[in-house]
Each structure stands twice: as C-alpha cells, then as structure tokens.
C-alpha cells in the first residue's frame, strides 16, 4: 500500500524538459546591431507558431485556461517560460508551462500522489511532442530535470532549533573549532547547502537546504532533484527517466524523514 501524509511538507513538484539553444538570444554585447534585432523578431514569430500549436494540443486535452507570462511583443530568450496552461476544472492546481526550449509540468498542493501527477504529466508530454516543429521532432532533449521542493514549517522545529531539526534528517554541520568556540547555537542559527553528485548512469543528484518563507511564515526548505542529459524525444523514454528519478527521490525522502514521520501524519491509501 502507498503512503501519503496529511501534514506533507511538499510545496511543489517540477518536471522540466529543455532543448535547443543554451544561450540567451540575441548574443550578449550585440543587442544594438540591426541584423540581430531582425533575428529576434523572426525567432519570436517562429516561437509564436509553436506556442499556438501547443495551446491547441492542450485545449484538445482539457487544458484550455491559458495565461501569457511575457507580454506580447516583448523579446523572449531561450529557456524563458511564456505561457501557462491549466485544466478547465478549477479544483485542479497542476499546470503546464512552455517557452522557447523549455517545458515544465508543475504539481501543486493538494498533491494527490504520483500516479495522478504522472497521468497529468503524460497529457502534457503528448501535447509537447505533437506540437514540436518538424525540424526538432528527432532532436534529443538536452536535459530532463525533476525536483521535489519541500518546506517544513515551524511545527516541525518549534521544540528545537533549526540545526537540530536538520540533524534529525541526517544533515550534520561541522564548523571549525574556532567558530564553534565563539558561536552560540539558537533558533537564529541556520545554514544553506547545495550538494551535487553524480549517479550511476550519468545523471546528477542535487540536494538544496535553505531558509524560505511560505505565506509569510519561515520554513526550512529541503529540495531533492535529479538531472538527466540527452534524452530521446519519445514519451516512453521520457517517462522511464522521470519515473526512475521519482523512485530514487522518494526513497531518499522517506528514509531521510523517517524520524519525523509521526509529525507528517502518515496514512495508507
């Protein structure tokens, strides 16, 4: 049986696909050249056709609420989100985002579990693959990134310090003796961490620990993510990579948070 948590710390799940140019357009330092201004307009026209095709594919899948993030006529650079698409059912919070060279699936609370999110993501991937320009359909995605962003509120560390809470998750902070001798650890003591390591098979695992704020209340952010490079542009290949990443992240999260599961209020579903 799967386990969900009534007091889950999850803030957002993000699956991001990238392709094409990795550098902003136009090139740095050449913005005054008339030829590059023309290129920007031409590029924008090509992007708009892709956006319209993607929007039509989303609409046919029940995602007809569109929101443009970048105003019409403004320059758009590779990797910048331009449109968001949501379900007609306003009770569903998940959304798709698209821009030149970037596509994301965003899962927001109330998170109904991976199978539900995976089904929504599959619809988004179908829409993306059906709307890619013909000259790009065989090109690999340069990267596939999945991130689980968790925010632990003060109810998780109200009886202890932030550092003690992080230690309960397995994060051990070791500072030089000179700093330890003059410091006084209390609720104002914190640390930020960005840990990146390689995984078997060539992917990367990233763990980020940082302070954050949610609805005006301080939280402890713990983000787990993976990145795979050069992924074949098929739904089968994409879902396989994403599911492998999900399973790894879920195992790390469940093992890491085992000491505080009682506060997360687990329930079988």
Task: Label each region the model flagged.
Residues 85-129:
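Hydrophobic alpha-helical segments and helix pairs
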Residues 79-91, 95, 140-226:
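Aromatic/basic-lined ligand-recognition segments
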């Amino acid at each position: 049986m799967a386990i969900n948590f009534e007091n889950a710390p999850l803030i957002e799940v993000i699956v991001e696909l990238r392709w094409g140019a990795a550098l902003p357009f136009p090139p740095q330092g050449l913005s005054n050249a008339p030829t590059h201004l023309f290129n920007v307009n031409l590029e924008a026209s090509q992007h708009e056709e892709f956006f319209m095709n993607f929007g039509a594919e989303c609409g046919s899948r029940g995602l007809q609420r569109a929101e443009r993030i970048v105003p019409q006529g403004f320059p758009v650079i590779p990797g910048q989100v331009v449109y968001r698409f949501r379900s007609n059912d306003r009770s569903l919070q998940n959304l798709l985002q698209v821009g030149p060279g970037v596509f994301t699936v965003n899962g927001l609370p109330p998170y109904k579990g991976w199978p539900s999110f995976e089904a929504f993501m599959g619809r988004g991937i179908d829409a993306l693959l059906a709307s890619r320009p013909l000259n790009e359909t065989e090109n690999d995605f340069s990267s596939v990134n999945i991130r689980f962003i968790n925010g632990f509120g003060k109810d998780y560390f109200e009886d202890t310090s932030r550092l003690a809470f992080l230690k309960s998750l397995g994060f051990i902070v070791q500072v030089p003796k000179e700093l330890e001798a003059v410091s006084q650890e209390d609720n104002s003591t914190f640390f930020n961490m960005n840990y990146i390591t390689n995984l078997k098979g060539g992917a990367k695992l990233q763990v980020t620990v940082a302070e954050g704020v949610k609805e005006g209340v301080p939280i402890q952010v713990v983000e787990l993510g993976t990145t795979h490079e050069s992924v074949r542009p098929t739904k089968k290949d994409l879902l396989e990579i994403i599911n492998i990443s999900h399973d790894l992240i879920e195992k790390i999260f469940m093992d890491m948070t085992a000491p505080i599961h009682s506060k997360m209020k687990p329930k079988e579903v």
